[in-house]
Every structure is written in C-alpha cells, then in structure tokens.
C-alpha cells in the first residue's frame, strides 16, 4: 500500500520542526521514524537556508511498506553540494547526514524550483 501526503511549509525557521511533526504523523504505522525525521529536518533546513526566501517550501512524503520518500521543493538557483565543514562549525553537515541515513537521494530541477528527495528505510 502507498500513501502520499503533501504540505506547504513556511519559509522560516519553524519549517524544520513542522516537517518533523508531519513525518511522525505520516509514519504512525512504522516503528522507527528517527532517521526519517532527521532527513526531513535537514532537507527543509537546506531549502530554507539556501533557497531564495520566496514562496513556501513544499514537502511531500510517500510511504510504502518499507520505504518513506521525503521530497522537499523550494525556489532555488543552486543545486545540492557537499562542502567541507570544520569540526566546530554549526553547519555544513546536512547532506552528509542525508547521504548516511538515506538508502538513496537526489535532486530534480523544475523551472525555478529545486526538489531534493531522499528514500529512508522504514522497518
């Protein structure tokens, strides 16, 4: 069975917390959503931090029997790229976390919109 949920999130610092709550709600039938919450939080935080600051952030969650796909779309000129982060730096680890926690991830450009997605295994 597949279920899909889509929400518009505010383009501000509250978006990541709202996204984590939506992951918990969408995954109410799975046992372990911690990885999915963290991936969603990083995707949304990156959209907010690196986007143009216009419009909303759109998050879509698609849940199948064993995988949760998290897709976050926002207005952005860039593409995701990992940067070297200093140990004491508070940022720069988002894509590294996504890469470690997701079984697959990528991005798509849709006109002026960047969509970044990640598939997280749900036991």
PLM region spans:
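Conserved beta-strand-loop-beta-strand hairpin that lines the nucleotide-binding pocket
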Residues: 1-6, 48-123
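Residues in soluble alpha-helical coiled-coils and helical-bundle/repeat scaffolds
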Residues: 10, 28-31, 106
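Conserved short strand/loop->alpha-helix "switch" segment adjacent to the catalytic nucleotide/phosphoryl-transfer site
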Residues: 17-41
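STAS-typified acidic loop motif
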Residues: 6-18
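Short, well-structured hydrophobic secondary-structure segments
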Residues: 39, 44-49
């Amino acid at each position: 069975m597949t279920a899909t949920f889509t929400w518009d999130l505010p383009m501000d610092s509250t978006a990541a917390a709202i996204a984590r709550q939506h992951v918990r709600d969408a995954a109410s039938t799975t046992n372990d959503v911690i990885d999915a919450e963290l991936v969603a939080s990083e995707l949304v935080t990156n959209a907010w931090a690196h986007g143009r600051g216009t419009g909303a952030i759109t998050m879509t969650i698609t849940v199948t029997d064993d995988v949760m796909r998290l897709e976050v779309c926002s207005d952005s000129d860039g593409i995701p790229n990992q940067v070297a982060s200093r140990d004491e730096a508070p940022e720069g680890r988002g894509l590294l976390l996504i890469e470690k926690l997701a079984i697959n991830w990528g991005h798509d450009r849709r006109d002026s919109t960047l969509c970044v997605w990640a598939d997280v295994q749900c036991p």
